[in-house]
Amino acid sequence: MLDITKMLHQIINLELKIDDEKELMIGPETRKQTIFVDLDISLSNMAEAAGWYKVVNPREADKEDLLKSYVQSVALLLLYSAKMQWTHLVVLDDQAWQRITNAKSSTKLAELNKSYLAIKHFLSDAYFNHQQESFRHAWHLLLKMGISDWQLTPDQISSAYQAMINQY
């Protein structure tokens, strides 16, 4: 199981460290917007690395880039939860974790497209309408996509996440 609480603390501390080092003076609303834009780009990078939607020129997923962009997306989603004071939405109990890890893997083009678009839809609803339940759905879908669909293990995710944190 992922240690979501630890990951959440790490990304918050990293943001504070970078803010201090760079002397960033960004207001809270602009900060949320910036995190959200960065999250959107990370999700697109994740889809690019996975490549499931490339039907004209199909290719194998770039597992290294996929893992890297996946953990960036996870980190930004966690950071956004902190900015919105929605951290209670990202902590998982054993039952929620089991539902995610035991979910049927999506392998068909339409299923993967739908999952990706649902994440984007739910995140937009969370951002523009402040819908906490939409945010929770996006979070669970993102975890399911990485763990069930792409078979990323919690150890792989944790290690890549730690490497991302350590690079700063």
Spans of model-derived segments:
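Flexible "arm" and connector segments at domain edges
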Residues: 1-168
